[in-house]
């Protein structure tokens, strides 16, 4: 079972060199990702401490955190565990803004020659951290005009305008959440049990779902598809990207979806 590291040490914020070493270990940037789904684009990943629910006092916990998140299984899980290693040493003092600042530094170090998937692992759970990364994304795009895109479970606490020019989709777990996320200014992605085919799917409140083209085989990867890089356009058309449960924790995800649907 995937779990976040047990907190065994609490301390005051250490000296700046130690802070730098610890926070740097919680961030990774790739000029060209080896992730087959997103394709040969740039990407960043950060510790799950940045996710809603990564700390006990977070007001909302991501449904899939330590409960089937795709980032916790298979080869990706190895990288995620590495990013989480320092959690016991920083949780007493590290803030969401700290992690976002170090992810921004990692983003700044990339060439900007390719589209960039922001935090394949990780999230922004408050407005300040989203603004820090939106500014870094603007610098990234200014280099060669390439888009920075991502998904967020933090949409309940962070309105869309804090993300600036980032193409960001609200990660929703039920159809009832689509209207709420839309009201926050977001285009949406919805996790579903499975895809029947590649056809548009009617959803609640006038939304329509597009089965992820990579998952249904009509596009090779995210780079060749590009739909999630057009989040505001998707919102304007009330189109929702449907992402079928996948990864090593797929059974847990499907169980969570079923439970959430029964409570709607």
Regions found by a protein language model. Give the residues of each.
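Class I S-adenosyl-L-methionine
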Residues: 1-264
């Amino acid at each position: 079972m995937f779990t976040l590291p047990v907190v065994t040490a609490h301390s005051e914020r250490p000296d700046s060199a130690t802070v730098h070493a610890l926070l740097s270990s919680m961030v990774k940037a790739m000029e060209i990702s080896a992730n087959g789904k997103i394709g040969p684009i740039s990407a960043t990943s950060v510790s799950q401490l940045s996710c809603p629910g990564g700390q006990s006092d977070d007001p909302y916990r991501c449904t899939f955190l330590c409960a089937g998140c795709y980032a916790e299984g298979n080869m990706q899980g190895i990288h995620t565990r590495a990013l989480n290693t320092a959690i016991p040493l920083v949780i007493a003092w590290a803030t969401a803004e700290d992690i976002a600042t170090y992810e921004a530094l990692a983003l700044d170090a990339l060439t900007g020659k390719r589209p960039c998937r922001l935090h394949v692992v990780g999230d922004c759970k408050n407005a300040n951290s989203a603004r820090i990364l939106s500014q870094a994304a603007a610098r990234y795009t200014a280099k060669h005009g390439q888009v920075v895109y991502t998904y967020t479970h933090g949409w309940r606490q962070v309105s869309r305008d804090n993300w600036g020019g980032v193409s960001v989709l609200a990660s929703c777990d039920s159809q009832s959440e689509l209207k709420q996320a839309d009201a926050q200014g977001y285009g949406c992605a919805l996790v579903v049990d499975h895809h029947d085919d590649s056809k548009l799917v009617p959803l609640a409140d006038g939304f329509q779902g597009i089965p992820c083209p990579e998952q249904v085989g009509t596009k090779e990867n995210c780079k060749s598809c590009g739909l999630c890089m057009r989040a505001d356009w998707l919102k304007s058309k009330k189109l929702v990207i449907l992402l079928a449960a996948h990864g090593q924790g797929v059974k847990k995800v499907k169980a969570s979806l079923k439970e959430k649907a029964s409570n709607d």
